[in-house]
Amino acid sequence: MAEGKGRVCVTGGTGFLGSWIIKSLLENGYSVNTTIRADPERKRDVSFLTNLPGASEKLHFFNADLSNPDSFAAAIEGCVGIFHTASPIDFAVSEPEEIVTKRTVDGALGILKACVNSKTVKRFIYTSSGSAVSFNGKDKDVLDESDWSDVDLLRSVKPFGWNYAVSKTLAEKAVLEFGEQNGIDVVTLILPFIVGRFVCPKLPDSIEKALVLVLGKKEQIGVTRFHMVHVDDVARAHIYLLENSVPGGRYNCSPFIVPIEEMSQLLSAKYPEYQILTVDELKEIKGARLPDLNTKKLVDAGFDFKYTIEDMFDDAIQCCKEKGYL
Protein backbone atom coordinates (compact mmCIF):
# COMPACT_ATOMS: atom_id res chain seq x y z
CA MET A 1 0.00 0.00 0.00
CA ALA A 2 1.38 3.42 -0.94
CA GLU A 3 2.02 5.52 2.15
CA GLY A 4 2.31 8.97 0.56
CA LYS A 5 4.57 11.05 2.78
CA GLY A 6 5.36 8.09 5.02
CA ARG A 7 4.05 6.58 8.22
CA VAL A 8 4.02 8.47 11.51
CA CYS A 9 2.76 7.73 15.01
CA VAL A 10 0.61 9.96 17.21
CA THR A 11 0.33 8.96 20.86
CA GLY A 12 -2.80 10.05 22.70
CA GLY A 13 -4.83 10.06 19.51
CA THR A 14 -8.22 10.30 21.21
CA GLY A 15 -7.33 13.58 22.93
CA PHE A 16 -8.15 17.10 21.76
CA LEU A 17 -4.75 17.82 20.25
CA GLY A 18 -3.87 14.28 19.21
CA SER A 19 -7.08 13.88 17.22
CA TRP A 20 -6.59 17.21 15.45
CA ILE A 21 -3.00 16.32 14.55
CA ILE A 22 -4.28 13.02 13.13
CA LYS A 23 -6.85 14.91 11.06
CA SER A 24 -4.15 17.24 9.72
CA LEU A 25 -1.71 14.42 8.97
CA LEU A 26 -4.33 12.49 7.00
CA GLU A 27 -5.15 15.64 5.04
CA ASN A 28 -1.44 16.04 4.29
CA GLY A 29 -1.02 12.55 2.87
CA TYR A 30 0.49 10.68 5.82
CA SER A 31 -0.33 7.20 7.01
CA VAL A 32 -0.93 7.37 10.75
CA ASN A 33 -0.55 4.93 13.61
CA THR A 34 -2.16 6.08 16.82
CA THR A 35 -2.18 4.65 20.31
CA ILE A 36 -5.14 4.25 22.63
CA ARG A 37 -5.47 2.54 25.99
CA ALA A 38 -6.75 -1.02 25.84
CA ASP A 39 -10.54 -1.28 25.81
CA PRO A 40 -11.41 -4.99 26.23
CA GLU A 41 -15.13 -4.32 26.55
CA ARG A 42 -15.11 -2.03 23.47
CA LYS A 43 -16.93 0.75 25.29
CA ARG A 44 -14.81 3.54 23.85
CA ASP A 45 -16.26 5.25 20.78
CA VAL A 46 -13.50 6.20 18.33
CA SER A 47 -15.84 6.89 15.42
CA PHE A 48 -14.80 10.55 15.51
CA LEU A 49 -11.40 9.30 14.31
CA THR A 50 -12.47 6.47 12.02
CA ASN A 51 -14.88 8.85 10.25
CA LEU A 52 -12.11 11.31 9.34
CA PRO A 53 -11.47 11.58 5.58
CA GLY A 54 -8.80 9.05 4.64
CA ALA A 55 -8.96 7.22 7.96
CA SER A 56 -10.30 3.96 6.56
CA GLU A 57 -7.17 3.54 4.42
CA LYS A 58 -4.48 5.32 6.40
CA LEU A 59 -5.31 5.32 10.13
CA HIS A 60 -4.35 2.35 12.29
CA PHE A 61 -4.98 1.85 16.02
CA PHE A 62 -2.65 0.22 18.55
CA ASN A 63 -3.25 -0.48 22.22
CA ALA A 64 -0.60 1.13 24.42
CA ASP A 65 -0.30 2.65 27.87
CA LEU A 66 2.29 5.00 29.39
CA SER A 67 2.46 2.68 32.40
CA ASN A 68 3.94 0.07 30.05
CA PRO A 69 6.26 1.93 27.64
CA ASP A 70 7.18 -1.29 25.80
CA SER A 71 3.57 -1.43 24.59
CA PHE A 72 4.33 1.39 22.11
CA ALA A 73 6.87 -0.61 20.09
CA ALA A 74 4.39 -2.04 17.58
CA ALA A 75 2.88 1.38 16.87
CA ILE A 76 6.31 2.91 16.27
CA GLU A 77 7.66 0.20 13.97
CA GLY A 78 8.20 1.55 10.45
CA CYS A 79 7.42 5.17 11.35
CA VAL A 80 9.54 8.14 10.25
CA GLY A 81 8.23 10.52 12.89
CA ILE A 82 6.63 10.37 16.34
CA PHE A 83 4.27 12.96 17.82
CA HIS A 84 4.13 12.25 21.55
CA THR A 85 1.05 14.12 22.74
CA ALA A 86 -0.13 11.63 25.38
CA SER A 87 0.39 12.82 28.95
CA PRO A 88 -1.35 12.15 32.27
CA ILE A 89 -3.40 15.18 33.37
CA ASP A 90 -4.45 15.15 37.00
CA PHE A 91 -5.33 18.67 38.11
CA ALA A 92 -7.39 17.19 40.94
CA VAL A 93 -4.20 15.62 42.38
CA SER A 94 -5.93 12.27 42.79
CA GLU A 95 -2.52 10.53 42.64
CA PRO A 96 0.75 11.47 44.34
CA GLU A 97 2.84 13.78 42.13
CA GLU A 98 5.76 11.34 42.19
CA ILE A 99 3.63 8.62 40.59
CA VAL A 100 2.29 10.93 37.86
CA THR A 101 5.79 12.24 37.15
CA LYS A 102 7.32 8.77 36.99
CA ARG A 103 4.63 7.60 34.58
CA THR A 104 5.12 10.67 32.38
CA VAL A 105 8.93 10.51 32.30
CA ASP A 106 9.24 6.72 32.03
CA GLY A 107 6.57 6.63 29.34
CA ALA A 108 8.31 9.25 27.22
CA LEU A 109 11.72 7.62 27.61
CA GLY A 110 10.31 4.19 26.83
CA ILE A 111 8.81 5.52 23.62
CA LEU A 112 12.15 7.11 22.72
CA LYS A 113 13.93 3.79 23.26
CA ALA A 114 11.44 2.17 20.88
CA CYS A 115 12.25 4.93 18.38
CA VAL A 116 15.96 4.09 18.59
CA ASN A 117 15.24 0.39 18.15
CA SER A 118 13.00 1.02 15.15
CA LYS A 119 15.91 2.33 13.03
CA THR A 120 13.34 4.30 10.98
CA VAL A 121 12.32 7.24 13.20
CA LYS A 122 13.98 10.45 12.02
CA ARG A 123 12.49 12.88 14.52
CA PHE A 124 10.64 12.66 17.85
CA ILE A 125 8.37 15.63 18.58
CA TYR A 126 7.33 16.01 22.20
CA THR A 127 4.29 18.12 23.08
CA SER A 128 5.30 20.17 26.10
CA SER A 129 3.50 22.88 28.02
CA GLY A 130 3.97 26.50 29.00
CA SER A 131 3.83 25.21 32.56
CA ALA A 132 7.34 23.84 31.95
CA VAL A 133 8.54 27.43 31.44
CA SER A 134 6.43 29.90 33.40
CA PHE A 135 6.80 28.85 37.05
CA ASN A 136 10.36 29.89 37.81
CA GLY A 137 10.12 32.73 40.32
CA LYS A 138 11.97 35.08 37.98
CA ASP A 139 10.79 38.66 37.65
CA LYS A 140 10.79 38.67 33.86
CA ASP A 141 8.16 40.05 31.50
CA VAL A 142 9.14 37.74 28.63
CA LEU A 143 10.36 34.14 28.78
CA ASP A 144 12.04 32.15 26.03
CA GLU A 145 13.30 28.62 25.41
CA SER A 146 16.18 29.08 27.86
CA ASP A 147 13.75 29.41 30.78
CA TRP A 148 12.55 26.42 32.79
CA SER A 149 10.01 26.08 35.56
CA ASP A 150 11.54 25.54 38.99
CA VAL A 151 10.42 22.10 40.15
CA ASP A 152 11.41 22.74 43.77
CA LEU A 153 9.40 25.97 43.76
CA LEU A 154 6.39 24.18 42.28
CA ARG A 155 6.55 21.45 44.90
CA SER A 156 6.82 24.04 47.65
CA VAL A 157 4.16 26.56 46.60
CA LYS A 158 1.79 24.06 44.91
CA PRO A 159 -0.10 26.42 42.57
CA PHE A 160 -3.07 25.07 40.60
CA GLY A 161 -1.87 22.33 38.27
CA TRP A 162 1.52 22.11 39.97
CA ASN A 163 1.78 18.33 39.66
CA TYR A 164 1.17 18.53 35.91
CA ALA A 165 3.79 21.30 35.61
CA VAL A 166 6.36 19.20 37.48
CA SER A 167 5.74 16.16 35.30
CA LYS A 168 5.91 18.13 32.04
CA THR A 169 9.08 19.97 33.10
CA LEU A 170 10.95 16.83 34.10
CA ALA A 171 9.70 14.84 31.09
CA GLU A 172 10.75 17.54 28.65
CA LYS A 173 14.21 17.74 30.19
CA ALA A 174 14.48 13.96 30.09
CA VAL A 175 13.57 13.59 26.40
CA LEU A 176 15.99 16.34 25.35
CA GLU A 177 18.79 14.75 27.37
CA PHE A 178 17.99 11.31 25.94
CA GLY A 179 18.12 12.71 22.42
CA GLU A 180 21.55 14.22 22.99
CA GLN A 181 22.94 11.06 24.57
CA ASN A 182 21.50 8.61 22.03
CA GLY A 183 21.77 10.51 18.77
CA ILE A 184 18.05 10.78 18.07
CA ASP A 185 16.58 14.06 16.83
CA VAL A 186 14.26 15.44 19.53
CA VAL A 187 12.14 18.58 19.25
CA THR A 188 9.82 19.89 21.95
CA LEU A 189 6.91 22.22 21.26
CA ILE A 190 5.82 24.31 24.24
CA LEU A 191 2.10 25.09 24.19
CA PRO A 192 -0.28 27.45 26.00
CA PHE A 193 -4.09 27.16 26.08
CA ILE A 194 -5.14 25.56 22.79
CA VAL A 195 -8.34 27.03 21.37
CA GLY A 196 -10.40 26.41 18.22
CA ARG A 197 -12.49 23.62 16.75
CA PHE A 198 -12.31 20.05 18.02
CA VAL A 199 -13.22 16.65 16.60
CA CYS A 200 -13.23 14.75 19.91
CA PRO A 201 -16.66 14.41 21.58
CA LYS A 202 -15.59 15.66 25.02
CA LEU A 203 -15.26 19.39 25.67
CA PRO A 204 -11.48 19.93 25.93
CA ASP A 205 -10.25 21.37 29.22
CA SER A 206 -8.24 24.12 27.53
CA ILE A 207 -11.30 25.32 25.59
CA GLU A 208 -13.43 25.20 28.72
CA LYS A 209 -10.88 27.42 30.47
CA ALA A 210 -10.45 29.76 27.48
CA LEU A 211 -14.24 30.20 27.22
CA VAL A 212 -14.66 30.73 30.94
CA LEU A 213 -16.32 34.13 30.33
CA VAL A 214 -18.79 32.64 27.85
CA LEU A 215 -19.59 29.63 30.01
CA GLY A 216 -20.10 31.85 33.06
CA LYS A 217 -17.62 30.00 35.25
CA LYS A 218 -16.07 32.96 37.04
CA GLU A 219 -14.83 30.75 39.87
CA GLN A 220 -12.52 28.94 37.43
CA ILE A 221 -10.57 32.04 36.43
CA GLY A 222 -7.04 31.45 37.71
CA VAL A 223 -5.04 33.86 35.57
CA THR A 224 -5.54 37.43 34.41
CA ARG A 225 -3.80 36.93 31.07
CA PHE A 226 -4.23 33.90 28.82
CA HIS A 227 -1.52 32.51 26.54
CA MET A 228 -3.35 31.15 23.49
CA VAL A 229 -2.84 29.42 20.16
CA HIS A 230 -5.24 27.99 17.58
CA VAL A 231 -5.36 24.19 17.51
CA ASP A 232 -4.79 24.14 13.76
CA ASP A 233 -1.64 26.26 14.13
CA VAL A 234 -0.44 23.76 16.74
CA ALA A 235 -1.02 20.83 14.37
CA ARG A 236 0.64 22.76 11.55
CA ALA A 237 3.64 23.51 13.79
CA HIS A 238 4.04 19.84 14.72
CA ILE A 239 4.02 18.84 11.05
CA TYR A 240 6.32 21.73 10.11
CA LEU A 241 8.90 20.59 12.65
CA LEU A 242 8.77 17.08 11.21
CA GLU A 243 9.06 18.11 7.58
CA ASN A 244 11.71 20.81 7.83
CA SER A 245 15.37 20.58 8.80
CA VAL A 246 15.18 23.02 11.68
CA PRO A 247 17.49 22.55 14.66
CA GLY A 248 16.29 20.28 17.45
CA GLY A 249 15.53 21.51 20.93
CA ARG A 250 12.74 23.63 22.39
CA TYR A 251 10.26 25.85 20.54
CA ASN A 252 7.67 28.11 22.15
CA CYS A 253 4.37 28.05 20.25
CA SER A 254 2.40 30.81 21.96
CA PRO A 255 1.59 33.67 19.56
CA PHE A 256 -0.96 35.54 21.70
CA ILE A 257 -1.36 36.64 25.26
CA VAL A 258 -4.82 38.02 25.94
CA PRO A 259 -5.61 40.06 29.07
CA ILE A 260 -8.92 38.97 30.52
CA GLU A 261 -10.30 42.52 30.17
CA GLU A 262 -9.56 42.47 26.43
CA MET A 263 -11.18 39.06 26.20
CA SER A 264 -14.32 40.42 27.87
CA GLN A 265 -14.54 43.37 25.47
CA LEU A 266 -13.98 41.19 22.40
CA LEU A 267 -16.52 38.54 23.37
CA SER A 268 -19.24 40.89 24.62
CA ALA A 269 -19.04 42.92 21.40
CA LYS A 270 -19.21 39.89 19.11
CA TYR A 271 -21.47 37.62 21.17
CA PRO A 272 -24.03 39.83 22.93
CA GLU A 273 -26.32 36.80 23.36
CA TYR A 274 -24.06 35.58 26.18
CA GLN A 275 -23.83 37.15 29.62
CA ILE A 276 -20.13 37.96 29.42
CA LEU A 277 -18.57 39.22 32.64
CA THR A 278 -17.84 42.93 32.27
CA VAL A 279 -14.48 44.62 32.77
CA ASP A 280 -15.78 46.10 36.05
CA GLU A 281 -16.87 42.67 37.28
CA LEU A 282 -13.44 41.28 36.48
CA LYS A 283 -11.52 43.87 38.50
CA GLU A 284 -11.92 41.86 41.70
CA ILE A 285 -10.20 38.79 40.21
CA LYS A 286 -6.68 38.33 41.55
CA GLY A 287 -5.33 35.55 39.36
CA ALA A 288 -1.72 34.98 38.44
CA ARG A 289 -0.17 37.36 35.90
CA LEU A 290 1.86 35.16 33.59
CA PRO A 291 4.81 36.55 31.60
CA ASP A 292 4.87 36.49 27.80
CA LEU A 293 6.33 33.48 25.96
CA ASN A 294 8.58 34.55 23.10
CA THR A 295 7.89 32.63 19.86
CA LYS A 296 10.68 34.27 17.84
CA LYS A 297 12.66 31.03 17.52
CA LEU A 298 9.76 29.19 15.85
CA VAL A 299 8.97 32.12 13.54
CA ASP A 300 12.65 32.54 12.63
CA ALA A 301 12.67 28.83 11.72
CA GLY A 302 10.14 29.68 9.01
CA PHE A 303 6.81 28.89 10.63
CA ASP A 304 3.89 31.27 10.03
CA PHE A 305 0.96 31.49 12.43
CA LYS A 306 -2.24 31.54 10.39
CA TYR A 307 -5.00 32.32 12.88
CA THR A 308 -6.01 35.43 14.85
CA ILE A 309 -7.43 35.73 18.36
CA GLU A 310 -10.87 36.25 16.82
CA ASP A 311 -10.47 33.06 14.76
CA MET A 312 -9.72 31.06 17.90
CA PHE A 313 -12.83 32.22 19.74
CA ASP A 314 -15.10 32.08 16.68
CA ASP A 315 -14.09 28.50 15.88
CA ALA A 316 -14.32 27.33 19.49
CA ILE A 317 -17.73 28.91 20.08
CA GLN A 318 -19.15 27.64 16.79
CA CYS A 319 -17.90 24.12 17.52
CA CYS A 320 -19.32 24.23 21.05
CA LYS A 321 -22.68 25.24 19.59
CA GLU A 322 -22.60 22.39 17.08
CA LYS A 323 -21.77 19.85 19.79
CA GLY A 324 -24.32 21.14 22.29
CA TYR A 325 -21.97 22.73 24.82
CA LEU A 326 -23.43 26.19 24.20
UniProtKB/Swiss-Prot annotation:
Record GO terms (molecular function): (3R)-2'-hydroxyisoflavanone reductase activity
Pfam families: Epimerase
NADP recorded as keyword: yes
Catalysed transformations (reactions): a (3R,4R)-4,2'-dihydroxyisoflavan + NADP(+) = a (3R)-2'-hydroxyisoflavanone + NADPH + H(+)
Keywords tagged on the record: Flavonoid biosynthesis, NADP, Oxidoreductase, Plant defense
Chain positions recorded as NADP(+) binding sites: 12-18, 37, 164
The keyword Oxidoreductase appears for this protein: yes
Tissue and organ expression note: Detected in roots, and at lower levels in root nodules. Not detected in petioles, leaf and stem.
InterPro entries listed in its UniProt record: Epimerase_deHydtase, NAD(P)-bd_dom_sf, NAD(P)_dehydrat-like
Biological-process GO terms, alphabetical: defense response; flavonoid biosynthetic process
Record text on activity regulation: Inhibited by vestitone concentrations above 50 uM.
Factors inducing expression: Transiently up-regulated by fungal elicitors, peaking 6 hours after elicitor treatment.
EC code: 1.1.1.348
Top-level taxon: Eukaryota
Summary of the function given for this chain in its UniProt record: Stereospecific enzyme that catalyzes the NADPH-dependent reduction of (3R)-vestitone to (3R,4R)-4'-methoxyisoflavan-2',4,7-triol (DMI). Has no activity with (3S)-vestitone. Catalyzes the penultimate step in the biosynthesis of the phytoalexin medicarpin, and thereby contributes to plant defense reactions.
Complexes and interactors: Monomer.
Protein name: Vestitone reductase
Native source species: Medicago sativa
Lineage: Eukaryota, Viridiplantae, Streptophyta, Embryophyta, Tracheophyta
